[in-house]
Each structure stands twice: as C-alpha cells, then as structure tokens.
Amino acid sequence: MYPKAYIDYLVEFHATRDYFECHEILEEYWKEDPPKKRKRYWVGFIQLAVALYHHRRQNTAGAKRLMANSIRILQAEHRAVEDLGLDHGRLLELMQSVYEQIETVSAYKSIILPIKDEKLEEACRIECRKKKYTWGQPSALSNIFLIDKHRLRDRTDVIREREKEIERRKKSRD
C-alpha cells in the first residue's frame, strides 16, 4: 500500500528522530525513479526532515530556508500528501507553526506528523516494535551523534560512490 521507504522514514521521524537518516532513506527512494519522473512531494518530505535536523542544531538560516521550501512544495501536493495517509491541512498548519518557531529562534521541539490512516500508523508502530523503538519518543537532545550526524558519520561509502560516478562520467565522455 505505502512504499517501505516511506514507512521507514516515518519510523525514524517519530521514534529515533534521526532526521539525517530520514533524508537518506527518502532520497535513495526518490532517486530510484528516472530524473524526469521523480516526485516533488518526496523532496518536500526530505526537506522537512533536513529542516528539523538544522533546527535542532540551531542552524536557523538553514532550517528556515528548508522549511519554507518544504511548505511550498507540500502545499502544492495536496492529493499526494493525502494519498500518503496524512492530513494535508493539519500538516501545513504544523509546518507553519514550526516555521514560526524557527523564525523566532525558539528551541527545537519534536513533532508528530498528522497521520490520518490508522493502518499506516499501525504499520509504523509494528515496525517500531520490531526494532525495539518507541513511537512518539521525543528527540534525545543529549545524543551528539544524532545532533551532529553529518559530521560524525562514516563517509567511506559516500566517497566511494562519488568516485564511481566521476569514473562513469569520464567513460561516457570518451
């Protein structure tokens, strides 16, 4: 019914609060489609997670820019958001509220996305239980790896993929 990547995103979003991982999960899924067939709403959800990542790190400028972009994209994707089991109106209200918190440099607070499809939420809760996560748990603000994951993660795979892409481009030019 829903893509596994989307359920994984929601689980990370609401249980571990690992917004960096949310971004990784959905970006990888989004890139599975050919460039001209990629869905904008996935970008909106990716940017929502990254905006919260920056907000939690007190990067106000980055959080504000990404949240504004996310709102703009998801505002235009009413049908897709609803088809993904969320309440579009409540989602936009929530995002606008977070945007205002960012704008006034208020402290980060964990949020719960307005899931209206009970079966979707149950699927997420089941996945949480399998992983021994707690659904709806607030962000662990003392977890430095969670807060600064972009700097502390192992980048070996990322570097290797970039090198492969450079080689592919060189070969395609020859």
Curated annotation (Swiss-Prot):
SUPFAM superfamilies hit by this protein: TTHA0068-like
Gene: ypuF
Superkingdom in the source lineage: Bacteria
Gene3D superfamilies: TTHA0068-like
TM region(s), chain numbering: none
Pfam families in alphabetical order: DUF309
Protein's name according to its UniProt entry: Uncharacterized protein YpuF
Coiled-coil regions, chain positions: none
InterPro entries from the UniProt entry: DUF309, TTHA0068_sf
Source organism phylogeny: Bacteria, Bacillati, Bacillota, Bacilli, Bacillales
